[in-house]
Amino acid sequence: MSDSTMDTQLALLVWGIAVCVTLAIVVPRWIGNNSKEPPSLGGSMLSNTYQYMTDMHGFLQRVASAQRSSKIIKFRLGPKKIYMVSGEKNIQAINRPSHSISPDVFFLEVMANVWGASKEEVGKFKQDQSGRSKNPVPGHDVKPGQPRLWHGQHRVYSEYLQRTDHANALSNKYFQLFSERLTKQPLGDWTELRLSHFFESDMAEAALVALMGPRIVELNPGFWPTMWEFARLAPRLMWGLPRWVNPKPWEIRELFHGMCRRYVDAAKREFDWNGPDVDAGWEPHYGSRMARELISWAEKNLSPETTAGMVATFIFGTNANSVPMSTWAMMELIADPELYHAVREECLAASTLDPATGERVFDTQKLLSMPLLQSVYIETLRLHVSINVTREVTQPISLDGHVLTPGSLIQAPSQIGQYSEVWGCDGHPASQFWAGRHLKHDSGRPEFTMAGRTASFFPFGGGPSICPGRVFAKQEILMTVAALVTRFEIELIEWTHPDGSKSDRPAQNDQSYIGAVGIPPDRDMKVRWKRLW
């Protein structure tokens, strides 16, 4: 047995003893039987905690099984009580603004563990109870001279990431950069490539440059391997084993934060805040107006180290969702040539030839409204996004006939998107991709519909903390698919392992990403393609 293995086992043993001692102290305080409390998940506290931290896929399977008899199941993550919630009415309830539950706890955990914010910085956000809206929550005005932190950050996202003109400018910049990469492919010749590798390089870099400019890659050799490793390990910073048991995620965090710090420092040195680019939609130092405004806000309220951590998390959040979702969508289309050509026809119908350049351009709004393309998009997210929407109970609240106690957490796994009772259709199990699942044909032509199931579909979270990048993400994914299916003939050669060796099965969800992010495929697809124009 190696020294490193013995060290790991010893660390796990010490960690287990520490947990048991803690439980011995606090368990007596929990004894008592409240009939209004929801039923408990089976298993011991220690086994549930360990499985939650190391095997989210298996843990959520147990939760799903338990929720067949109760929509709310409780368990303890160490000393913290957590309610796992499903059911349309319950999901709607936790996503409504409420004085009894707060979405802030998840963001504060991200700040502390993924951004690397200090206790003092996290404390300032905790103290700010004024909310995200323009007007402070009644009775929670901040003191004179103190910033409204939640509102300040929310305003940047609302103005520069979600407002139609800024969102369209950002997606158009991305499409320009991505198209430039596609035109470098040989015209009329068949070539081979691995699909996931293409998306993780060409698509990811086009999106990064559109958002953050080119300097972050130029300043940091080895940027992409480090970014993807950070994306893989970031969920473990939130819910995984302690740093002293598993230090690797924190080591990668520090390395990637350092890269982002170089980018932030260089932009601050080189950008002229009194020059003509101060209101530009895009310039090469910061990249997009959104990035410039967000970093400007952060530098007024956070340390340079935490600002870099915020940038790192934003980059991870952007690429670790849109890239695997685009990969999955294209894998499904390529594996089904009839579907591929049907989506192509829709995309061509949403495009025109530019008379000045002869280039094909897309009407973005028309493209986003195409029924089959929308159904493919929703079906992809339904199957391949896995997040646990998290809320903190701040006052006693009744939910589904149960009373949830203050200080506890509520989590709603998006795995409900795969429940047969919600999404299953004859001949089309909820566990399988079906492009027609979100279409109806009442008028004789296909129409997109969610059929009243929106409460069972929340890949971007919900309520006041819903993902601010969802507008850009949808445009980015659909424009990527449209560009590829209209420009290329693509044929499946074989499925491969990530190292390029042949696989005996198609891709499945990589279970190590369950619970916190868009899930990438665990296999790659080797294809041959030919550029048509």
Curated annotation (Swiss-Prot):
<feature type="binding site" description="axial binding residue">
    <location>
        <position position="467"/>
    </location>
    <ligand>
        <name>heme</name>
    </ligand>
</feature>
<dbReference type="InterPro" id="IPR050529">
    <property type="entry name" value="CYP450_sterol_14alpha_dmase"/>
</dbReference>
<dbReference type="GO" id="GO:0008395">
    <property type="term" value="F:steroid hydroxylase activity"/>
</dbReference>
<comment type="function">
    <text>Cytochrome P450 monooxygenase; part of the gene cluster that mediates the biosynthesis of calbistrin A and related compounds. Calbistrin A is a secondary metabolite with an interesting structure that was recently found to have bioactivity against leukemia cells. It consists of two polyketides linked by an ester bond: a bicyclic decalin containing polyketide and a linear 12 carbon dioic acid structure. The polyketide synthase calA is probably responsible for forming the decalin moiety.</text>
</comment>
<feature type="transmembrane region" description="Helical">
    <location>
        <begin position="8"/>
        <end position="28"/>
    </location>
</feature>
<keyword id="KW-0408">Iron</keyword>
<keyword id="KW-0503">Monooxygenase</keyword>
<dbReference type="GO" id="GO:0016705">
    <property type="term" value="F:oxidoreductase activity, acting on paired donors, with incorporation or reduction of molecular oxygen"/>
</dbReference>
<keyword id="KW-1133">Transmembrane helix</keyword>
<keyword id="KW-0472">Membrane</keyword>
<dbReference type="GO" id="GO:0005506">
    <property type="term" value="F:iron ion binding"/>
</dbReference>
<dbReference type="InterPro" id="IPR001128">
    <property type="entry name" value="Cyt_P450"/>
</dbReference>
<keyword id="KW-0325">Glycoprotein</keyword>
<dbReference type="Pfam" id="PF00067">
    <property type="entry name" value="p450"/>
</dbReference>
<dbReference type="GO" id="GO:0016020">
    <property type="term" value="C:membrane"/>
</dbReference>
<dbReference type="GO" id="GO:0020037">
    <property type="term" value="F:heme binding"/>
</dbReference>
<feature type="region of interest" description="Disordered">
    <location>
        <begin position="123"/>
        <end position="148"/>
    </location>
</feature>
<feature type="glycosylation site" description="N-linked (GlcNAc...) asparagine">
    <location>
        <position position="388"/>
    </location>
</feature>
<keyword id="KW-0560">Oxidoreductase</keyword>
<dbReference type="GO" id="GO:0043386">
    <property type="term" value="P:mycotoxin biosynthetic process"/>
</dbReference>
<comment type="pathway">
    <text>Secondary metabolite biosynthesis.</text>
</comment>
<feature type="glycosylation site" description="N-linked (GlcNAc...) asparagine">
    <location>
        <position position="33"/>
    </location>
</feature>
<dbReference type="InterPro" id="IPR002401">
    <property type="entry name" value="Cyt_P450_E_grp-I"/>
</dbReference>
<dbReference type="InterPro" id="IPR036396">
    <property type="entry name" value="Cyt_P450_sf"/>
</dbReference>
<keyword id="KW-0479">Metal-binding</keyword>
<comment type="similarity">
    <text>Belongs to the cytochrome P450 family.</text>
</comment>
<keyword id="KW-0349">Heme</keyword>
<keyword id="KW-0812">Transmembrane</keyword>
<protein>
    <recommendedName>
        <fullName>Cytochrome P450 monooxygenase calL</fullName>
        <ecNumber>1.-.-.-</ecNumber>
    </recommendedName>
</protein>
